[in-house]
A protein has these predicted regions:
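General structural feature for long, well-ordered alpha-helical segments within catalytic domains
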Residues: 8-11, 15, 32, 62, ...
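Surface-exposed helix-capping loop/turn segments at secondary-structure junctions
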Residues: 23-26, 72-76, 200-204
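A conserved short coil-to-beta-strand element within the FAD-binding core of flavoproteins
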Residues: 30-42, 75-93
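Rossmann-like flavin
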Residues: 1-69
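Phosphate-binding active sites in nucleotide-utilizing proteins
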Residues: 54, 67, 71-77, 88, ...
């Protein structure tokens, strides 16, 4: 967790100490300014927290794994049939879709930020926010060693965070930049490359 301003470093140290003292979690390590710049390959960062037990998650494989486990448990998955409404009746719940309906004993609204108008009591409580990610072309070994020699997944201290890691085929996956709308941006490249180029100006 690299800090983009020096003032956040003390908070990182306190967080590491808290995890160690209160949870006996001894994998938290505080990295100095120089150490953080060495592992990120960027002089834009100061010190920060490093979780030595951290892991990377492949979102698509994770979703496919959940789907596989769901099917193995006996559930059915209806693709391309979004729920448009539901009604709780005496002995079941009726879920309506564009082309039909499903009878269920109970339902779980697990829609992340994409609930839309399915549950109107929550509509006004959801802030639409889109965050974007780009991937570079495959990088040579020298560049990989320069920008991420320990193969760490980073998320920095900015309010609109920048997060980045290497892919299996040596691309830099970089997320950053947001818009607050139901509509996706038509051109995400400049939104994401601006913060990327500030951190890694040589990756142009």
């Amino acid at each position: 967790h690299p800090n983009h301003e020096q003032k956040y470093c003390e908070e990182s140290k306190q967080y590491d100490d808290h995890m160690i003292k209160n949870y006996d979690y001894k994998d938290m390590v505080y990295l100095s300014d120089d150490e953080m710049r060495e592992v990120t390959g960027s002089d834009t960062y100061y010190g920060g927290s490093y979780d030595e037990a951290e892991a990377h998650c492949h979102p698509l494989n994770y979703a496919l794994g959940i789907a596989k486990a769901t099917l193995s448990a006996g559930a059915k998955i209806y693709e391309n049939s979004p729920a448009t409404s539901y009604k709780v009746l005496d002995d079941h719940v009726r879920v309506n879709t564009k082309n039909g309906s499903i009878k269920a004993d109970r339902i779980v609204l697990a829609c992340n930020g994409y609930l839309e108008n399915l549950e109107k009591s929550l509509t006004s409580k959801i802030l639409p926010m889109n965050n974007y990610i780009v991937a570079t072309k495959p990088l040579d070994d020298e560049t990989v060693q320069k920008i991420n020699p320990k193969d760490i997944a980073f998320a920095d201290s900015r309010f609109v965070i920048n997060y980045f890691r290497m892919s299996a085929d040596k691309r830099l996956l970089f997320g950053g930049g947001e818009n607050y709308s139901q509509e996706l941006s038509k051109n995400i490249v400049p939104i994401v490359t601006r913060p990327l180029e500030k951190i890694y100006p040589f990756l142009n």
